[in-house]
């Protein structure tokens, strides 16, 4: 329904404009006719309008039912005016009208060109509806008038005076209000009319006016009116203060602008405008064109003013000029438009990377939330995984999926805090930190910012860069990042920071706590094969100028390269080996084309040709061949570059019960060996180990590859198995590897890096893996995403160490071990192996 079909409230605001002056000064005369309330009176619903007694107001009428009511009335007929509870209702029922209103007289009606009517009504008395008697053709109701008390005494005089003062103040503060209105207000002697008239014209919501007419007693209505008048005075005074301040600031700016233009014109006329002043003017123009924050504008304007007073030959000139140029070069308030299309983003992520489902899901979740709430803070992610799994390239793909700029800085070897926060301008050659420089390079305030190798940050006497990153990577603080060079807060809250690390251990706990860690595991053989066929081989063929139709790689050949020429968690060395093959092929193609009889036959790389392309095999899958000696167990280890297998060797010799540990072991690993030996001693009867074995025989535990430092609790199970094997003279079953932490009670605790360890075991030819019972969930998760890669590996889970030893050790060949003492010097002998 269009607007012209509704009643329009035509009540003037508290400005008391020109047309009302006469109405105010002419107070209404007493109604001579007596309104009879013994019968039903017609009811006219009003939208957002309240009729007060004694007040004359114009009302627009457009509804047919209301027009029918007005046409049926005789001159000066009484009508009950009730406001609707909901102004949007076109045909209100009795339940949709307020029960309190006013009875008034229709003084005049006027038909409008659009067939609506304009009526002039005068309120007479407040009434309350007792019951509605009809609804068609218009509403009618039986009403009861409300008696008004006599307004006498000092108290009502005070109410009247206060009301007049506030009304006059509002007229004084209101723009375009005639001065006569204030005089007319002061001349009103009837307190009831004064209160009702001002209440009718004050600019407050209609619901508040309805509460005012429902209030019992003039005192209550007067107090409510004074409350609204006070509020209006406060609003107008505050508005005036704001306008005065704005006008003063504008006058100052205009005066400064005019003076500068005059100075510029005078200098041009005199030919005195030098290059320095031209530079200063260009800087001022640049400040005016850029949408800088108020604080930044104030600082840079002061620096430009200082620049205009510094001689160009002074060293301070270049320092100040560089500072101003840096501020103007930053993208204050400029953001790249992010066009969010989840299907397109998912397509881009899948085009660039194979697998990595968790990471892709996290990015798509962020995009979905960003589409629902555009002002959300960007996440702080940390990709943790071995080298070569695609952490850095994944950041580029994320930027492409978001449609944003990509900035990368390497933090490896950074030791100076100023690299992050910048140098203060007091130093010679000072400059912003690498964060602000990256934002400047990006040219936008919401790039994808990669902090590469965050785990390789150092620290020295110049400070700890990790501490400076705490503010950068804290969403609650980085909206006002303070660079030492700028000394002005810069908003980094819309920047999507992505950190990369090979391991989390070197990262300080407070910094780690600010990031959402996403672990990227090493690739399985199946994943590497797909990555090679889909990404690496096509890329290397293109980089070496070889057409795809000229060369093809057999799948078995690619698998052979993966298993025999690389041993890594990622695919970086795999790409190098493929590049080596492509170089040899490129040489062959060129030689064939330069020969007398060019040969364009496509080349197929098969397994038999790998020796020609890459030389002898570098790795063998049977590295964990069966060991025929007791005291040797195979463990699983996690390293920053992926998983690996670990041999634990033990032997006994004549001695005094010492434990000898070699192989460059860390403190945690040494403690695991001590705990394993203590557990064996406590369970010697169960494993049928004589007491003499611990008193008169030394045991030596060695971990090969002694040049490599080793540490961690996950070798505890393997060390205990090795010790149990040498003391019981029972061999470990072949093709079994294990991992887990042990306690003195013989419990097996869960460890991390399960997927990497399982991949290492599979590469080494292990067919059965023993794991802590609580790591079963990790294996299930790995099987869900890479089930085919572990099809030929079985898993067993243990909670107690004695159960594991009973399972993994074969029966003793010569019965129980014998540790004898032949003489009083305790010279022992054993039927087992003294060394390996």
Swiss-Prot record:
It is an enzyme of class 3 (hydrolase). It comes from the Bacteria. GO terms for molecular function: ATP binding; ATP hydrolysis activity; ATP-dependent peptidase activity; sequence-specific DNA binding; serine-type endopeptidase activity. This is Lon protease. It holds the Pfam family AAA. CDD domains: RecA-like_Lon. ATP-dependent serine protease that mediates the selective degradation of mutant and abnormal proteins as well as certain short-lived regulatory proteins. Required for cellular homeostasis and for survival from DNA damage and developmental changes induced by stress. Degrades polypeptides processively to yield small peptide fragments that are 5 to 10 amino acids long. Binds to DNA in a double-stranded, site-specific manner. It catalyses: Hydrolysis of proteins in presence of ATP. ATP binds at residues 385-392. The keyword Nucleotide-binding applies. It comes from Chloroherpeton thalassium (strain ATCC 35110 / GB-78). PANTHER family: ATP DEPENDENT LON PROTEASE FAMILY MEMBER (PTHR10046). It is found in: Cytoplasm. Belongs to the peptidase S16 family. The lineage of its organism: Bacteria, Pseudomonadati, Chlorobiota, Chlorobiia, Chlorobiales. Homohexamer. Organized in a ring with a central cavity. Its EC number is 3.4.21.53. The keyword Hydrolase applies. NCBIfam families: lon (TIGR00763). The active site is at residues 714, 757. Induction: By heat shock. Residues 627-811 form the Lon proteolytic domain. GO terms for cellular component: cytoplasm. Residues 41-233 form the Lon N-terminal domain. Keywords: ATP-binding, Cytoplasm, Hydrolase, Nucleotide-binding, Protease, Serine protease, Stress response. Residues 816-836 are annotated as: Disordered.
């Amino acid at each position: 329904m269009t607007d012209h079909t509704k009643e329009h409230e035509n009540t003037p605001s508290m400005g008391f404009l020109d047309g009302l002056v006469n109405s105010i000064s002419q107070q209404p005369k007493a109604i001579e006719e007596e309104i009879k309330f013994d019968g039903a009176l017609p009811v006219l619903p009003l939208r957002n309008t309240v009729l007060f007694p004694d007040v004359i107001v114009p009302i627009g009428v457009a509804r047919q039912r209301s027009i029918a009511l007005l046409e049926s009335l005789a001159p000066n007929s009484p009508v009950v005016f009730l406001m609707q509870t909901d102004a949007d209702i076109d045909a209100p029922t009795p339940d949709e009208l307020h029960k309190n209103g006013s009875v008034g007289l229709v003084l005049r009606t006027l038909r409008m060109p659009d067939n609506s009517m304009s009526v002039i009504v005068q309120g007479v008395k407040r009434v309350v509806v007792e019951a509605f008697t009809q609804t068609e053709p218009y509403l009618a109701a039986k009403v009861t008038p409300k008696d008004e008390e006599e307004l006498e005494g000092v108290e009502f005089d005070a109410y009247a005076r206060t009301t007049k003062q506030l009304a006059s103040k509002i007229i004084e503060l209101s723009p375009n209000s005639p001065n006569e209105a204030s005089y007319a207000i002061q001349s009103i002697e009837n307190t009831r009319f004064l209160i009702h008239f001002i209440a009718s014209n004050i600019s407050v919501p209609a619901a508040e006016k309805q509460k005012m007419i429902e209030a019992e007693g003039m005192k209550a209505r007067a107090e409510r009116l004074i409350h609204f008048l006070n509020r209006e005075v406060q609003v107008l005074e505050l508005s005036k203060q704001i306008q005065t301040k704005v006008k003063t600031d504008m006058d100052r700016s205009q005066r400064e602008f005019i003076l500068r233009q005059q100075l510029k014109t005078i200098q041009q006329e005199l030919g005195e405008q030098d290059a320095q002043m031209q530079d200063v003017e260009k800087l001022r123009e640049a400040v005016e064109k850029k949408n800088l924050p108020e604080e930044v504008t104030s600082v840079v304007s002061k620096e430009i003013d200082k620049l205009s007073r510094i001689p160009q030959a002074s060293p301070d000139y270049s320092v100040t000029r560089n500072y101003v140029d840096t501020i103007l070069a930053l993208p204050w308030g400029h953001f790249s438009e992010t066009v969010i299309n989840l299907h397109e983003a998912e397509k881009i992520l899948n085009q660039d990377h194979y697998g990595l489902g968790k990471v892709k899901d996290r990015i798509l979740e962020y995009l979905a939330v960003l589409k629902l709430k555009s002002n959300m803070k960007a996440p702080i992610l940390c990709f943790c995984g071995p080298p070569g799994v695609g952490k850095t390239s994944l950041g580029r793909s994320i930027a492409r999926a978001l449609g944003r700029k990509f900035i990368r800085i390497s933090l490896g070897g950074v030791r100076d805090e100023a690299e992050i926060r910048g140098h203060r301008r007091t130093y010679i050659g000072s400059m912003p930190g690498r964060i602000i420089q990256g934002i400047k390079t990006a040219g936008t305030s919401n790039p994808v910012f990669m902090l590469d190798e965050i785990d390789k940050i150092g620290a020295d006497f110049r400070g700890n860069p990790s501490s400076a990153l705490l503010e950068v990577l804290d969403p609650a603080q980085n909206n006002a990042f303070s660079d030492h060079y700028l000394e002005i807060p810069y908003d980094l809250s819309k920047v999507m920071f992505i950190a990369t690390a090979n391991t989390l251990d070197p990262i300080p706990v407070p910094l780690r706590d600010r990031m959402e860690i996403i672990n990227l595991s090493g690739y399985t053989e199946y994943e590497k094969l797909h990555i090679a066929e889909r990404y690496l081989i096509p890329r290397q063929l293109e980089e070496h100028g070889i057409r795809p139709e000229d060369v093809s790689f057999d799948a078995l050949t690619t698998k052979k390269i993966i298993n025999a020429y690389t041993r890594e968690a990622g695919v970086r060395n795999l790409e190098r080996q493929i590049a080596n093959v492509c170089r040899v092929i490129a040489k062959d193609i060129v030689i064939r084309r330069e020969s007398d009889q060019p040969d364009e036959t496509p080349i197929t790389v098969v397994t038999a040709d790998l020796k020609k392309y890459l030389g002898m095999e570098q790795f063998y899958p049977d590295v964990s061949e069966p060991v025929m000696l007791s005291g040797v167990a195979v463990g699983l280890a996690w390293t920053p570059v992926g998983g690996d297998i670990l041999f634990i060797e033990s032997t006994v010799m004549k001695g005094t019960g010492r434990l000898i540990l070699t192989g460059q072991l860390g403190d945690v690993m040494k403690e695991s060996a001590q705990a394993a030996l203590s557990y064996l001693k406590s369970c010697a009867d169960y494993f049928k180990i004589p007491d003499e074995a611990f008193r008169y025989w030394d045991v030596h535990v060695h971990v090969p590859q002694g040049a490599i430092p080793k540490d961690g609790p996950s070798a505890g199970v393997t060390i205990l198995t090795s010790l149990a094997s040498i003391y019981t003279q029972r061999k470990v079953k072949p093709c079994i590897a294990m991992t887990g932490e042990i306690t003195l009670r013989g419990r097996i605790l869960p460890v991390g890096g399960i997927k990497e360890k399982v991949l290492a075991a599979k590469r080494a030819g292990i067919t059965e893996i023993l794991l802590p019972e609580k790591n079963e969930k990790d294996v299930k998760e790995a099987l869900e995403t890479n089930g085919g890669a572990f099809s030929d590996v079985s898993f067993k889970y243990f909670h107690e160490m004695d159960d594991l030893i009973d399972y993994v050790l074969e029966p003793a060949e010569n019965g129980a071990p014998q540790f004898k003492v032949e003489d009083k010097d305790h010279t022992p002998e054993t039927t087992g192996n003294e060394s390996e």
